[in-house]
């Protein structure tokens, strides 16, 4: 039977490019949906996001999706992307501080306006290709080399509260969590749908993953 992948639509995300990338890797039925019943019935769920975290969390709470995300991420493969990843943390310092869903301990921090590396001033947002160092083996890293490059666009980074949940490290002036995992949940700061070969491989791995780790 064909599996169903739900891409959660709460009005804040690069939804159709994510959906197209999932279709490209053979995800089966890909449904971009804001219907809680459709999302609950899906075999696996993707939670993308772009924009300001305050706006994202306001919509998530208005739709009741904070509880929905907690529910559906417990018992099936679940992938958070970019701001969708940041929303899974406890709190973001963006917009004078915003409480988030709290599935992963930790904070979302601003890179700052005075970010330097080896004497060079770094522009914020962090935009472009950067390496991800794999901290541990995980099914979603299958056939992706360590230090592979992925595409990032973000002004805020994740300071993880539990180092054991960090499965991928990034560096841009400061070290940050590029990927987090716990049980059937996996979340990435980068955009796999924009990351060419390695990004598509990660999505293909997600589609094949049974949610165990």
Curated annotation (Swiss-Prot):
<protein>
    <recommendedName>
        <fullName>Imidazole glycerol phosphate synthase subunit HisH 1</fullName>
        <ecNumber>4.3.2.10</ecNumber>
        <ecNumber>3.5.1.2</ecNumber>
    </recommendedName>
</protein>
<keyword id="KW-0028">Amino-acid biosynthesis</keyword>
<comment type="subunit">
    <text>Heterodimer of HisH and HisF.</text>
</comment>
<feature type="active site">
    <location>
        <position position="193"/>
    </location>
</feature>
<dbReference type="GO" id="GO:0004359">
    <property type="term" value="F:glutaminase activity"/>
</dbReference>
<dbReference type="GO" id="GO:0000105">
    <property type="term" value="P:L-histidine biosynthetic process"/>
</dbReference>
<feature type="active site">
    <location>
        <position position="191"/>
    </location>
</feature>
<comment type="pathway">
    <text>Amino-acid biosynthesis; L-histidine biosynthesis; L-histidine from 5-phospho-alpha-D-ribose 1-diphosphate: step 5/9.</text>
</comment>
<dbReference type="GO" id="GO:0016829">
    <property type="term" value="F:lyase activity"/>
</dbReference>
<keyword id="KW-0963">Cytoplasm</keyword>
<dbReference type="InterPro" id="IPR010139">
    <property type="entry name" value="Imidazole-glycPsynth_HisH"/>
</dbReference>
<keyword id="KW-0378">Hydrolase</keyword>
<dbReference type="InterPro" id="IPR017926">
    <property type="entry name" value="GATASE"/>
</dbReference>
<dbReference type="Pfam" id="PF00117">
    <property type="entry name" value="GATase"/>
</dbReference>
<keyword id="KW-0368">Histidine biosynthesis</keyword>
<feature type="domain" description="Glutamine amidotransferase type-1">
    <location>
        <begin position="4"/>
        <end position="213"/>
    </location>
</feature>
<dbReference type="InterPro" id="IPR029062">
    <property type="entry name" value="Class_I_gatase-like"/>
</dbReference>
<comment type="function">
    <text>IGPS catalyzes the conversion of PRFAR and glutamine to IGP, AICAR and glutamate. The HisH subunit provides the glutamine amidotransferase activity that produces the ammonia necessary to HisF for the synthesis of IGP and AICAR.</text>
</comment>
<dbReference type="GO" id="GO:0000107">
    <property type="term" value="F:imidazoleglycerol-phosphate synthase activity"/>
</dbReference>
<feature type="active site" description="Nucleophile">
    <location>
        <position position="82"/>
    </location>
</feature>
<keyword id="KW-0315">Glutamine amidotransferase</keyword>
<keyword id="KW-0456">Lyase</keyword>
<dbReference type="GO" id="GO:0005737">
    <property type="term" value="C:cytoplasm"/>
</dbReference>
